């Protein structure tokens, strides 16, 4: 029931301001001057922005999308030596799930998104844990956020591999 989407890799400032608190990402995003565009930091931003200024009839909901795209961030090395390498690189590919739904259905779909992520990791046979992120760490956009952290035996620690947020009416 999901539509596969290859989202745009650039967004203008107006579109970005409509889908996130730009201050959460602006310091790690690549800006393209003088055009006022940004390379995307994560693919759920353009997936959501694609619906900007659209009037969606309730009968057409939910809209379920999966986006696959390269993402770009300037945060390499910004989080200390233990986060170098694959975890903090300038370009990486992500798969994102986005559901646009009726407000009263958002919590059920949030559970569905989390279940999809857990099913994927279960199918890989990898050990992970689900972390319920405290409100002080989820930023202004999300109402609730879960992370899946996979156990990396070589590193001897869990690392975040999935985030699953309910942004309610942001």
Over which residues does each language-model region extend?
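TRNA-recognition modules of translation machinery and tRNA-sensing kinases, especially anticodon-binding
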Residues: 1-170
